[in-house]
Amino acid sequence: MSRGAMQPSQQKLAEKLTILNDRGIGMLTRIYNIKKACGDPKAKPSYLIDKNLESAVKFIVRKFPAVETRNNNQQLAQLQKEKSEILKNLALYYFTFVDVMEFKDHVCELLNTIDACQVFFDITVNFDLTKNYLDLVVTYTTLMLLLSRIEERKAIIGLYNYAHEMTHGSSDREYPRLGQMIVDYENPLKKMMEEFVPHGKSLSDALVSLQMVYPRRNLSADQWRNAQLLSLISAPSTMLNPAQSDTMPCEYLSLDTMEKWIVFGFILCHAALNSDPAALSLWKLALQSSTCLCLFRDEVFHIHKAAEDLFVNIRGYNKRVNDIRECKESALSHAGSMHRERRKFLRSALKELATVLADQPGLLGPKALFVFMALSFARDEIIWLLRHADNIQKKSTDDFIDKHIAELIFYMEELRAHVRKYGPVMQRYYVQYLSGFDAVVLNELVQNLSVCPEDESIIMSSFVNTMTSLSVKQVEDGEVFDFRGMRLDWFRLQAYTSVSKASLGLADHRELGKMMNTIIFHTKMVDSLVEMLVETSDLSIFCFYSRAFEKMFQQCLELPSQSRYSISFPLLCTHFMSCTHELCPEERHHIGDRSLSLCNMFLDEMAKQARNLITDICTEQCTLSDQLLPKHCAKTISQAVNKKSKKQTGKKGEPEREKPGVESMRKNRLLVTNLDKLHTALSELCFSINYVPNMMVWEHTFTPREYLTSHLEIRFTKSIVGMTMYNQTTQEIAKPSELLTSVRAYMTVLQSIENYVQIDITRVFNNVLLQQTQHLDSHGEPTITSLYTNWYLETLLRQVSNGHIAYFPAMKAFVNLPTENELTFNAEEYSDISEMRSLSELLGPYGMKFLSESLMWHISSQVAELKKLVVDNVEVLTQMRTSFDKPDHMAALFKRLTSVDSVLKRMTIIGVILSFRSLAQEALRDVLSCHIPFLVSSVEDFKDHIPRETDMKVAMNVYELSSAAGLPCEIDPALVVALSSQKSENISPEEEYKIACLLMVFVAVSMPTLASNVMSQYSPAIEGHCNNIHCLAKAINQIAAALFTIHKGSIEDRLKEFLALASSSLLKIGQETDKTTTRNRESVYLLLDMIVQESPFLTMDLLESCFPYVLLRNAYHAVYKQSVSSSA
């Protein structure tokens, strides 16, 4: 440009204001962090609390800013030792204070320049210039106030300087000025009031220009309501008309910011209050609106006390002091209720706005101003509440507790989301607006200017050209717009045209200023939507009010009608990083961590609340399902039978038991059940959880639905285990069928959650139910598989071994036997077909496999004991094996055998366990046949078509597959695996094989002893014996098959040998005359038939060759005849 160097337009006011304002925020951030660090014992510089330096610190503070190092060696001796560390660790603090001093110098220099240039300020005309000027004044004032609040400032500066003096022999060059500044600004406002006397006119002019903006922004809710503020539907005919104003940027200017300008501005240029009624009016209005102002973040300034303390000492200010006291009373009495009503209005206004824009996003173009006004108004009210609730000066706190604050924040977030989502819609609208209307109007205005210097003309022509060149195609092509240069040029132009000697005075061309302010707003709608959202709706201040933030969240969750808005709190955590500044990078990590921890906590609490509601619903549904269990209809059946036989057993007046389903009958629609309330609360909370799929917080992605999924998995796991009602002391456990009913009820409720939240509940089922099929879950806790396995092994089967329970093949169940001590459970209710199928449904193939393996482990321990007994009798058994055709010799050898009863007892236990396993396997097969019939039939085909010449390893693999599907196999793979692990290193394979052969011999020759047992009587009704010896058939076949598979022997040959020995031994008792010995001879004979029937390797023809069939037939006749006579 061609102007002289000394001209005011060359002072670069725009650039300096921009840079100093940004630097001021950075300095505030650093000073704030120093204040907080000094206030926290953990973060405080260690030298300030070091006992060894205490006397030195006190001395330095007392003498500050003077430096005396010569005569105080004793007090400063410790300082001498640590001088290098002090220099190193306090440098950041010291030079921050130096930076504040330099910032103060630059601000004072700029303020003097502005005064010298006699700059014209009017917020409605040169908005950017006036705003930046007022911002600078307030930032400067705030910085000096915050500095004065650091109690340790003298100690830090003094310590550093003394360490510098001791190290370098002289004070730091900045220290004299810095020390003097600290002393001068002990009472910063008083000092600044003197300092601002020369700047009074400029500052008061700028402030008084707010009379066109502040009073109409600071209205009551009733006035807003009457004006139908922010309503798009109040005048449908104008809905598509662009929202216009002569003061566009003032419409969304923060009320909080204006109040700070007015309060601090008129404290600094207080003379205007006495001379200008407009100034006094603004001052009073601001004092009546709040009791405290936000200095920076959570640092507040109590307006009335500070102003009164300053004015009370000024002569002739009694009237102003009285004004302050009156305004304070008014603020305490009415401000709370006024702001409460405003928040109430804004809730409904923002809801309407968000709803209309969601339906018609195209309205974001013409009505963008309404959106940013709404956001700004709501943000101001929320910040006001947050600040005042934390600094209440009134006994009644009702006005400062807003349980509906979440709703207001939610609608703000909804509007923000609309702006982000439909940004291209707004860009498209305003690109056309700028090129088709703004450029034309501005061009006309420029053409009609009477005087327009060359420089100003060039700038304005560039504006017109920039706007004219815009097209919709640029938006469609995704071109990135950048109008920052244009906005800075307008800022410069404001500075050039607002000085007193300007050829083109903006004060004389207000229309130009207003038009350009509108154009600047339109450019921001194209390239700065994100920045606009931060400017109008940033709520990062919540980061510094953690306790209030958490309290608001808890209140939101406690109120069912507000829980749908609880997602607002995690969403606010996304704002936190916007409060950081590049001049203080070290706080980014701290604020980032706080945002992450708060977001995590909020989402976790929301998920927990939803989980608890779901659990309550599940509990109710489980109770309702329980009412439908067959056991509950016994009383109804009994009453029906009695009624039919005309027996009156019930007492008169006995209330009739409610039938299931009564809860669904409503007398009227106003009746609300507990379940209704739970469903309503859940749907509200789930709306919140489902509101956003994910959110970004400090480069971390949070997915609210995953929190719910995780909590549901944990709770479902605990609930399933809890519903087993396993009591280790009393050994009580829920029946599998009842547990299955409860689990299905629980799963039905969980499936219904998919109607509320888009979560994959099938994944939850798969994760949880698959874990329940294992011994332990992912947290190392016992599962229903381990609980039921332990119960069946340690409780049910142990009582079978003790003779209290018998296996009834006819019923395919274990049944209690009459004993002196009644059992606490009915075995049939846990082991019949329906219960075993329910168990299979619950445990699945994996769980049933674990159950089988546990059973096999018990069998293997019994076989190990049997082998020991065989080893003890190995010589006798070897002889008996080859002497079965010598009756006398066999009798003599038999008498030499030991532990015969123990062998039979252990083999019976093995048989019982195998019988239980066959029940479980059969149930598993039935269940899988329903679920996967085609797969089961394929496995069955595999098993049934194994060629005889197939390698045993291949056959065992097929058997393992078949066993996993619940199919019976010739050789039990699980039993083979269990017995294989018993191989002893000290015994050769040949010896092991011999022991296995002799074990079968031992069992065969021991069988006749069973006939003498009273309990060995066969019962046709149960198709077995009460002492479970019928289970020997299964034990003998399965053990033989497993052992001779392991030792690669012929199973068929060994079983033939067993049959020969057993039949020979049993035929002998036919010749016995002792009735005691032959008491249940016929019942024992039947065991041979059972063994052959059970075996895939033996045939009836083979039995016929060893044991006359006529004996078997007679035995059956005898036992049936005996059972008829005993029952008669």
Curated annotation (Swiss-Prot):
Chief location category: membrane
Ranges annotated as spanning the membrane: 995-1015
Basic and acidic residues bias (residue ranges): 651-665
GO BP annotations, alphabetical order: cell migration; cell morphogenesis; cell projection assembly; cortical actin cytoskeleton organization; neuron projection morphogenesis
Family matches, as InterPro entries: Nck-associated_protein-1 (IPR019137)
Region called Disordered, residue ranges: 640-665
Localization per Swiss-Prot or TrEMBL: Cell membrane; Cell projection, Lamellipodium membrane
Entry membrane topology: Single-pass membrane protein
Keyword match Plastid: no
Source species, domain of life: Eukaryota
Function, as annotated: Part of the WAVE complex that regulates lamellipodia formation. The WAVE complex regulates actin filament reorganization via its interaction with the Arp2/3 complex. Actin remodeling activity is regulated by RAC1. Plays a role in neural tube closure.
Annotated protein name in UniProt: Nck-associated protein 1
Organism per entry: Danio rerio (Zebrafish)
Organism lineage: Eukaryota, Metazoa, Chordata, Craniata, Vertebrata
